[in-house]
Amino acid sequence: MEKYILYARKSTDTEDKQVLSIDAQLAELRKFARDNKLVVIDELIEKQTAKSPGRPIFNSMIKRIENNEANGILAWHPDRLARNSIDGGQIIYLLDQTSLNFLRFPV
């Protein structure tokens, strides 16, 4: 069964200010999930840049996927998940290990 964690992130970095607000991301993601009949087990919101590793909400999501609570991530755009090689590598590793089976983006 596909079980998704919805992840919305808005950076505090000035270069990333043009990205949709958290509320706008959530609205689009909820609509996408509803339209595609996706099972969302939780919604996680993070307000931090992804240029450096160590985001607490992202790391907790990774742990939950490793613990088989979910096997999919729903995010507004791939750059909401990772903008550094360590976090990107964690996503790739989970895909390789088949802990993470689904990455969905409405854009």
Where are the predicted features?
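Short, structured surface patches at the beginning of a domain
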Residues: 1-107
